[in-house]
């Protein structure tokens, strides 16, 4: 384990003393260091009547147990303090460490003890993580250090788990949205599942906008999947025009109805454990699936601002600006009198996407978004550079396939009976508008692009994203992060995993950082918390995170690709084509080792490079026909230690998100030897070689010169490493599988690779 602590706020000694005493620690700044430490340790073991026993089981050094030390005249030294602290954090002498000083350096221990400043050190110790992934204080509170009294308590600017999760209110309301997506003449009602503590305090809300949470129709999804095999279409040359327009909601007038309570309860809804963490700390949790989902009205519009508006209406209800009913009868209103009106949205993938989209509406009350692996433009999810481009791992999926998956109203037989015929007409229209035949950008996709609306964002934006996420690719966070106005507070956590959550990783205090941030933004704590703009997981060493100023450097290094001309044959023998089509992972494996139809270039790295941004290929290419796909990948090639892209479980159920509540596993990305690591990749329709909105003819056998910008990344290369550049046509994971006979020729002498370099490293 290594410490990467971003959540700690240094406090004046008077405030630290006050906060420690409020928790029951008999410590003052006038006490001798040794006595203060003994009082602290005995309080730690509050569940023991005889605290001598647990002290007897710890050591002060490798020759003396802790009880003996406290009963002796020996002075407290830094080495003894650190040895005791490590044990309180779960590190075991003779198992985890045999030399305290060496181990402190190895784990980058964040606490600096100085004689006469024991109180500050103990204050810091309480909010430092144990080996189990919980802070020492969170662990103590989960065991009953202070009462669970449904009131707010804070330490180091963080809300503590003092809200009772054994006796929660679970209720359902139906919010009226300014939509009629199914055109039945009534405004669509949106089902809202609410979980909140029983308290007199007005609560801020953690809201997860999840089209999945009311069920998914896997059967309909699988039937709708597209066949990937086919010929690449030749498109007529033209310029595409689109219009950015604001969504116009329908009028949703208030109605004079009696006010009552919810009439519907529930026992369980699939939780997001980060929400659970905040539930125990005085935040309501709400789960909303939006239009076209079971329990709600309307059709699934999939990614446009009508869908977003169905979630926005819920935030408006929490702020008294829209109404909710107690049932589908619409005869009694429910008021969110328990809510403060302040909202943080959470969730990964589609859930995080709706967080980003909601932020671009500028809705009042949305204070923070925590958008994880979020889409910023749906075109960039299902298309790329004029090509159909399936998200990684899901060949054959498209937006209308996702519509079928999430239109959970069809899982309710009554709704199916009444609405399916009309819904199928709606779905057919959606399938036509997404224009799978050409792969081009159009108004349908532009209406599902949140980037043109980034200027409306007011909320503090927190993003997490995997630089190995080939499902929601890194371009999504790169684009939205850099599109936000300078007035917006923004933060990004970039890791080397794939499409995964990171809140329960051992190496970074993400939960505590979010607690500190939300306690300031939504609970009125005057924290003056400074969270770095960008926090990046260093790929060159295990469990190391560092802060960077920006995502995307303007400094460039140029690498030559060669001096000759090389060809890429698009066509495969039938058996080989079928083998790759059957299992795209076989194709990827053979591509990386130079066995597929590809130009394979190994570039020796002569300097240390810290890549930050979008790698660009400057290419001179010709095609034997009037069409062509060009795909590219850039690998860090050669065996060395690298991160795996899926976290492993270190300790099952180690993390308690409250008081014996919503336990979850502690995880971390393994750092092991591997043959290669993809740094970036991309696909391009050569007819879109200039830009996305310009479709050009491809003159057969004539040279074309263009720039091919790949997915952004942040990655360290060391002198002596090898960059493997792969240029090929069909990508069996992502693109249409065209097996026609054409050849691409690349003039390497007139081509190069441009790498964005952080802080001039390598220039």
Swiss-Prot record:
The active site is at 349 (charge relay system), 469 (charge relay system), 499 (charge relay system). HAMAP family: Aminopeptidase_S15 (MF_00698). One of its GO terms (molecular function) is serine-type peptidase activity. This is Xaa-Pro dipeptidyl-peptidase. Belongs to the peptidase S15 family. GO terms for cellular component: cytoplasm. It is found in: Cytoplasm. GO terms for biological process: proteolysis. Its EC number is 3.4.14.11. It catalyses: Hydrolyzes Xaa-Pro-|- bonds to release unblocked, N-terminal dipeptides from substrates including Ala-Pro-|-p-nitroanilide and (sequentially) Tyr-Pro-|-Phe-Pro-|-Gly-Pro-|-Ile. Homodimer. It is an enzyme of class 3 (hydrolase). Its main location: cytoplasm. SUPFAM superfamilies: alpha/beta-Hydrolases, Galactose-binding domain-like, X-Prolyl dipeptidyl aminopeptidase PepX, N-terminal domain. SMART domains: PepX_C, PepX_N. Coiled coil: none annotated. InterPro entries: AB_hydrolase_fold, Galactose-bd-like_sf, Pept_S15_Xpro, PepX_N_dom, PepX_N_dom_sf, Xaa-Pro-like_dom, Xaa-Pro_dipept_C. Keywords: Aminopeptidase, Cytoplasm, Hydrolase, Protease, Serine protease. Removes N-terminal dipeptides sequentially from polypeptides having unsubstituted N-termini provided that the penultimate residue is proline.
